[in-house]
């Protein structure tokens, strides 16, 4: 319709990032666009998604070191977003889960403000998944976070479900 076309023209260049996951039996299937991330936490922390950002490209091409990327002035420039163009390339992944795994999905409002090691210690130190989620948000705020802070924690083999 022409109304939808008008909205798209006015909002041209705007977009959002996304990370999504589904679990079937012991397999997790997940996807991302932009710099929203999925981490796997168990004995350590591992980022399973790749950021679609300018600094991530610079790291992949060897232009800067991963440590430099964390504080690079262009770290918020993303190279893919939903809605920025008529179509977008989505990265899809799969991972076999095991007992003790915890999945953390988050926006850059968390990952830009809290180092991976601190994320790990906060999640492992919580009494339960809800307390851990609240502590992650508080840590981002305490570190100066002003961006949207989106956090999802999943314990795939938990006996009960808790929602924050």
Residue ranges and their predicted role:
Residues 1-8:
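Short, small-residue-biased leader/transition segments that mark boundaries at the very start
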Residues 9-14:
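Catalytic core regions of nucleotide second-messenger enzymes
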Residues 16-106, 110-164:
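Conserved subregion of the PPM/PP2C metallophosphatase catalytic domain
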């Amino acid at each position: 319709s022409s109304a939808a076309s008008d909205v798209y023209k006015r909002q041209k260049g705007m977009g959002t990032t996304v990370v999504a996951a589904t679990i079937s039996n012991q397999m997790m299937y997940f996807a991302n666009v932009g710099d929203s991330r999925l981490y796997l936490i168990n004995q350590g922390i591992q980022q399973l998604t790749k950021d679609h950002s300018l600094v991530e490209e610079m790291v992949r091409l060897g232009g800067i070191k991963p440590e430099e990327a964390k504080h690079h002035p262009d770290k918020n420039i993303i190279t893919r977003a939903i809605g920025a163009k008529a179509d977008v390339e989505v990265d899809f992944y799969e991972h076999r889960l095991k007992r003790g795994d915890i999945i953390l999905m988050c926006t850059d409002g968390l990952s830009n403000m809290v180092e991976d090691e601190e994320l790990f210690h906060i999640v492992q130190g919580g009494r339960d998944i809800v307390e851990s989620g609240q502590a992650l948000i508080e840590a981002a705020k305490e570190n100066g976070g002003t961006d949207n802070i989106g956090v999802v924690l999943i314990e795939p083999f938990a006996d009960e479900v808790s929602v924050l």
